[in-house]
Structure formats: structure tokens, C-alpha cells
Amino acid sequence: MKFIIALAALIAVACALPVSNDNFRHEFDHMIVNTATQRFHEIEKFLLHITHEVDDLEKTGNKDEKARLLRELTVSEAFIEGSRGYFQRELKRTDLDLLEKFNFEAALATGDLLLKDLKALQKRVQDSE
């Protein structure tokens, strides 16, 4: 019975504490990481799809197709480089907890891997004639 009373008192104290104004910042961080992760997943699917198109391009050598592929790769590359800059700046913040820091580092590492694959594919497209 004493345990239940102590637990109820603890819950009442926790509910009475003022809400931190930082919650918005942490929710925004969570939303940004989720959005970037979803976009990285879309870019990964795009890379898989476009790899087949690059194989066809190497066989045909169509210049219009080459220009289109380069434009699409450039847009994805710009998104990843922009997100890398954002995540690097956010990692310098001192108010990050362990989970947020891990999420930012994971998103940064995922972006780096995708950027490496994008650049390799871009080089393949540029070298095809």
C-alpha cells in the first residue's frame, strides 16, 4: 500500500513540473531526422532503379538520357550535401542528449554512404559514351 501511495505521489509531482521550452526543439530534431531518413530511403530506391537505366545508357549512348540521368543525380546529391551540412552543424550543439546525437550521427553516416554511391554512379554516367 505504501508503494502505491509513493508511486501516486511521484506521478503527481512529475505532472506538476513545468514543461520545458526545449521540447519543441527536440521534437523538431526528431521530425527532421525522420524526414531525412525517409528521403534517404527514397534515394536508395532511386539508386537501385537508376542503376538499370545506366546499364541501358552504356549500351545505347543516348545523350538526352545521359543529360536526364545527370540532372536527377545532381538533385539527389545536392539534397544529401545539404543535409550533411545541417547534421554537422546540429552535432555541434551542446544540448543534445545521447539518443539525439546517435540519430544525427546515423543520418550523417547514411548520407555519406549514399553520397559515395551517387558519385560513383555519376562518374559511370559521365564516362558512358
UniProtKB/Swiss-Prot annotation:
Residues 1-16 form the signal peptide. Midgut and hindgut contents as well as fecal pellets (at protein level). GO terms for molecular function: IgE binding; protein homodimerization activity. Changing residue 45 to A: Over 20% reduction in IgE-binding. InterPro entries: Mite_allergen_group-5/21, Mite_allergen_group-5/21_sf. Changing residue 84 to A: Over 20% reduction in IgE-binding. Changing residue 66 to A: Over 20% reduction in IgE-binding. Keywords: Allergen, Signal. Belongs to the mite group 5 allergen family. May exist as homodimer and homotrimer. This is Mite allergen Blo t 21. The lineage of its organism: Eukaryota, Metazoa, Ecdysozoa, Arthropoda, Chelicerata.
